[in-house]
Every structure is written in C-alpha cells, then in structure tokens.
UniProtKB/Swiss-Prot annotation:
Its EC number is 2.3.2.29. This is Aspartate/glutamate leucyltransferase. GO terms for cellular component: cytoplasm. It comes from Pseudomonas putida (strain W619). Coiled coil: none annotated.
C-alpha cells in the first residue's frame, strides 16, 4: 500500500445530492496539488474513491451512507442468460483502444446520448467544454474504448487501467440502438478485458439501493460492495 497517511484531503460544503433529492451531500477530494499517481489511485480505489476529470473523490456525508462502492470480481463473474444474449447480440462489434482526445465524432455521440437518456440530469445540456473537462484528460492510465459496427461509432467506454483493475469512468452510446443494450455490453466487455489483462476487478462506482438508475449494477453477479471498510460479496 502507498503511504496514504501522508495525503491531504478536502471536504466540500454540504450541497444538494444528485441522486437522493431529499439529502444533502458532502464530498471528500484528494488534494488537487497531489500528482495523479496510478498507484495512489489504485490504493484509493480500494477505499471507495472514484475519478472525475482531474479529481479523486468519494462521498463523505454526515447523515447518509447510501452510496456504496461496487466492483465486479472478474475471475468469479458468471453471465446470466440475458447477459449471454447481449454478448451474442453484439458479437459483430469491434473494440479499439484510443487515447483520450476531443473529436467531433465523440462529442456528437455524447451529445445525443445525454439529450436522449439524461435530459433530466445535471449533465444537461451537454457542451464541448463539459465533455472535455469531464472525460478528455491527459492521463497515462485513461483510455477511450471505441465500439464500432463496420466503422460506425456506437459507443465509447472511458476506463482507467489500474494495477488492480479497470475503473469504469463513463460510457456513452448510440441511443437509437436500444436493442443492443450497449451500456450493459460495455460492462460485460470490460469484465472480459479485465480477465484478459489478469486484473482483479471492474470498479463500477457507487450503488445506491433507493436509486433506480443504479439498479443495473447489481445485475452483475457476484458483485462486491465496500461495507464498513471491507469488500463484501453479494451473490
């Protein structure tokens, strides 16, 4: 483990929670002057931290612990019948790793995805600056995985390649290809890629029991939840 005790962290003032409208949220951030070291990041991911843009953070709320870090142990994952169908349905896609960059092709897909799927969220309306600040970061461990059908871009999974696993930062995809279940397929592909690279887990961020948008995460079994500073398996 990295000497995490030497790191500095800062907490935000309470603000409206993005997921539970009746709650106030507080976020703990790693000191932004701390270099984004991949080993520090990996150690912090074991403690429930996530990356957004150039920042590592985790919830630090006074009166709520609803946000539970979740990860899929790649070697123990077993796809269910629906997931096997999704894998078969998307077997015609090719996946290519690319360095983070701003491309109109990426932004057009991102814009249509946000406008169609998340028009009620805090990422609407999408903008080029928002896209770049959130996703296009010059970090050596960050990758854009492009999912294409005969050259046509259908999805992009933004992932961080860490020593202990893949951290799924964000996925955006073609909203008109609903039958393909591209968001679910992207997670299934990342599990397969983690296995191929002999990585321990795919980190999915936070699961919130009373948030419908988070329900999909527990469809991948077994899944591990960070409870009382221990990763506990949910079969």
């Amino acid at each position: 483990m990295t000497e995490l005790a030497r790191l500095k962290f800062y907490a935000t003032q309470p603000h409206s929670c993005s997921y539970l409208p009746d709650e106030q949220a507080t976020t703990l951030f790693l000191d932004p002057s701390q270099p984004m070291d991949v080993h520090v990041y990996a150690d912090l991911s074991e403690m429930g931290f996530r990356r957004s843009g150039d920042h590592l953070y985790r919830p630090h709320c006074q009166n709520c612990n609803a946000c539970v870090p979740a990860r899929i142990p790649a070697a123990r994952f077993i796809p269910n019948r629906q997931q096997r169908r999704i894998l078969k349905r998307n077997a015609d896609l090719t996946v290519t790793a690319a360095r983070p960059a701003f491309k109109e092709e990426y932004f057009d897909l991102y814009r249509r995805y946000i406008e169609t799927r998340h028009a009620d969220g805090d990422m609407y309306p999408p903008s080029r600056d928002q896209f770049s600040t959130f996703l296009v970061r010059d970090l050596p461990f960050c990758w854009f995985y492009e999912f294409r059908l005969a050259g046509r871009l259908l999805a992009v999974a933004v992932c961080d390649l860490l020593p202990n696993g893949l951290s799924a930062v964000y996925t955006f995809y073609e909203p008109d290809e609903e039958r393909r279940s591209l968001g679910r397929f992207a997670i299934l592909w990342q599990i397969t890629e983690a296995l191929r690279q002999d990585l321990e887990a795919v980190y999915l961020g936070y699961w919130i029991k009373n948030c419908k948008k988070m329900n999909y995460k527990t469809q991948y079994r077994p899944i591990e939840l960070l409870i009382n500073q221990r990763w506990v398996t949910l079969n």
